[in-house]
Amino acid sequence: TYLQALPYFDRLLNIQPPPREKMFEFYERMHAAYIRPGGVHQDLPLGLMDDIYEFSKNFSLRIDEVEEMLTNNRKTQPYDVYDQVEFDVPIGSRLYTEGYQVPPGATYTAIEAPKGHMLADVVAIIGTQDIVFGEIDR
């Protein structure tokens, strides 16, 4: 729909698509099923190599922007050794409430309960059980 493409419209009226869209265009022109057992499916589409070359010349200018975006998102919930690595993250202001403050010394962390290990899920779990009393002795 048009609504999905809304974030990609810029002041040039979408004359120049974002780099990701361009990479997907290359992928669509040479699909993953291009290489098959016994050889390739067909010749490369006309103009594909020229388009990839032009894209790679222009994309190299945006490498720093992409690196900044990908390396600064590991500070909020670090994993592996990210909490031991020193790097800066831009800090802004919050427009939402802080929520519950855990007292010092108490432990709080985000968890997932995919199997319903939370108390609120007990009613739903019991409701999904189909108890047949004739088979209880088994």
Swiss-Prot record:
Entry's Gene Ontology cellular component terms: mitochondrial inner membrane
Cofactor: [4Fe-4S] cluster
Record's cofactor remark: Binds 1 [4Fe-4S] cluster.
GO BP: cellular response to oxygen levels; gliogenesis; mitochondrial electron transport, NADH to ubiquinone; mitochondrial respiratory chain complex I assembly; neural precursor cell proliferation; neurogenesis
GO molecular function: 4 iron, 4 sulfur cluster binding; metal ion binding; NAD binding; NADH dehydrogenase (ubiquinone) activity; oxygen sensor activity; quinone binding
Pfam family of the protein (one): Complex1_49kDa
Superkingdom as given in the UniProt entry: Eukaryota
Membrane topology according to the record: Peripheral membrane protein
Compartments, as annotated in UniProt: Mitochondrion inner membrane
Translocase keyword on record: yes
EC number(s) stated in the UniProt entry for this protein: 7.1.1.2
Gene3D superfamilies: Cytochrome-c3 Hydrogenase, chain B (1.10.645.10)
UniProt cross-references to InterPro entries, sorted A to Z: NADH_Q_OxRdtase_suD (IPR001135), NDH1_su_D/H (IPR022885), NiFe-Hase_large (IPR029014)
Primary location recorded for the protein, binned into one broad class: mitochondrion
Reaction equation(s) it catalyzes: a ubiquinone + NADH + 5 H(+)(in) = a ubiquinol + NAD(+) + 4 H(+)(out)
Disulfide bonds: none
Keyword line: 4Fe-4S, Electron transport, Iron, Iron-sulfur, Membrane, Metal-binding, Mitochondrion, Mitochondrion inner membrane, NAD, Oxidoreductase, Respiratory chain, Translocase, Transport, Ubiquinone
Known role: Core subunit of the mitochondrial membrane respiratory chain NADH dehydrogenase (Complex I) which catalyzes electron transfer from NADH through the respiratory chain, using ubiquinone as an electron acceptor. Essential for the catalytic activity and assembly of complex I. Redox-sensitive, critical component of the oxygen-sensing pathway in the pulmonary vasculature which plays a key role in acute pulmonary oxygen-sensing and hypoxic pulmonary vasoconstriction. Plays an important role in carotid body sensing of hypoxia.
Family: Belongs to the complex I 49 kDa subunit family.
Subunit structure of this chain's protein: Core subunit of respiratory chain NADH dehydrogenase (Complex I) which is composed of 45 different subunits. Component of the iron-sulfur (IP) fragment of the enzyme. Interacts with NDUFAF3. Interacts with NDUFAF7. Interacts with CERS2.
PANTHER family in the cross-refs: NADH DEHYDROGENASE [UBIQUINONE] IRON-SULFUR PROTEIN 2, MITOCHONDRIAL (PTHR11993:SF10), NADH-UBIQUINONE OXIDOREDUCTASE 49 KDA SUBUNIT (PTHR11993)
Listed name of the protein: NADH dehydrogenase [ubiquinone] iron-sulfur protein 2, mitochondrial
Name of the gene this protein is made from: NDUFS2
